[in-house]
């Protein structure tokens, strides 16, 4: 809800979220975007996220949600993005479809195709998925957008001869909007003239897109989301920051606590904070975050700063970087060991570089 309020205040009325892919292969680079491996939990979170983003679509603080990536994108062979998926109907229906059905039940406005193929047919050109299940059995009334260039990607899959062929396959299958491949823009009109694509399919796609614009109220006021004063008021609102902190605190899972070392005693005299992430602001933003050189860092608190603000006056903090965010240089190990030997407690902050996961 807060993300929608702030996004809408900045003039945004459509977000490409939630990502509701079930992820069971840790090698896949987009695991961190979703809710994990369980279809029940994934469905509950998917439903809640759609409700949070959209609220009542006509409201000024609502944004259209987009359920992605339909479907089985997270089951690509070997965890290789854009790869093939070989899956039984039972696995599809019991595990991978439920979170998407939950978004339909929540009234999600849009769907996005997956880059993968499913049993030999790319998701973007898969009539069984888009027309038979999504728009047929589930009676989805919104529209389907391709993923970035995924209509053209059907050529790379070896399923379409060229973009002209890909456009025909995609619109026939039920993909309503072409994002970035220009296959519709360059080919759809001619395909209709040649009677290779019924005009009724184009009409249906256009109707679905316009319907959602009406639902947002954009035809009544195309600038309803453009309000600089509201943007100043809503962005980094203290109540929003407080809620974000509360959500983060409630979401942390403690996997191990040997000798009951946590919570740290306020009487701890010396704490060593070691690792390349300790003073790196970017580390707190995770993957798919904008390059921090381009944003205001006023509200970014490093792990070091956070701990520094929290410990008592009688606690001494020591720091050693130890190693770089990525690479194999061990020159900093000696300093890290020395700092550790001077301390009562060591906090080690290491992890994957921000740009090592994703597509």
Regions picked out by a protein language model, each given a short descriptive name:
Residues 1-359:
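Glycoside hydrolase catalytic-domain context in secreted enzymes
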């Amino acid at each position: 809800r807060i993300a929608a309020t702030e996004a809408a205040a900045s003039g945004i009325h459509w977000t490409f979220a939630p990502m509701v892919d079930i992820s069971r292969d840790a090698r896949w680079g987009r695991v961190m975007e979703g809710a994990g491996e369980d279809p029940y939990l994934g469905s509950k979170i998917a439903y809640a996220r759609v409700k949070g983003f959209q609220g009542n679509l006509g409201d000024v603080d609502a944004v259209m949600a987009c359920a992605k990536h339909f479907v089985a994108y997270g089951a690509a062979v070997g965890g290789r993005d854009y790869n093939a998926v070989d899956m039984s109907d039972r696995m599809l229906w019991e595990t991978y479809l439920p979170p998407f059905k939950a978004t339909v039940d929540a009234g999600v406005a849009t769907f996005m195709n997956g880059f993968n193929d499913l049993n030999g047919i790319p998701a973007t050109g898969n009539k069984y998925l888009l027309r038979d299940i999504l728009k047929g059995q589930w009676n989805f009334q919104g529209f389907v957008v391709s993923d970035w260039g995924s209509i053209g990607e059907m050529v790379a899959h070896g399923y379409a001869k060229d973009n002209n062929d890909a456009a025909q396959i995609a619109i026939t299958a039920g993909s309503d909007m072409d994002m970035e491949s220009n296959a519709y823009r360059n080919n759809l009109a001619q395909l209709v003239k040649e009677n290779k694509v019924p005009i009724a399919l184009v009409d249906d796609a256009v109707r679905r897109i316009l319907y959602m614009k009406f639902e947002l109220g954009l035809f009544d006021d195309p600038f309803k989301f453009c309000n600089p004063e509201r943007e100043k008021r809503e962005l980094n609102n203290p109540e929003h920051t407080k809620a974000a902190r509360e959500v983060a605190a409630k979401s942390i899972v403690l996997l191990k606590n040997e000798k009951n070392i946590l919570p740290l005693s306020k009487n701890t005299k010396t704490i060593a904070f070691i690792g390349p992430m300790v003073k790196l602001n970017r580390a707190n933003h995770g993957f798919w975050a904008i390059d921090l050189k381009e944003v205001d860092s006023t509200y970014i608190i490093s792990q070091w700063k956070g701990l520094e603000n929290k410990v008592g006056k009688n606690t001494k903090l020591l720091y050693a970087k130890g190693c770089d965010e990525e690479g194999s240089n061990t020159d900093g190990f000696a300093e890290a060991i020395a700092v550790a030997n001077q301390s009562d407690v060591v906090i080690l902050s290491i992890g994957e570089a921000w740009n090592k996961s994703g597509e």
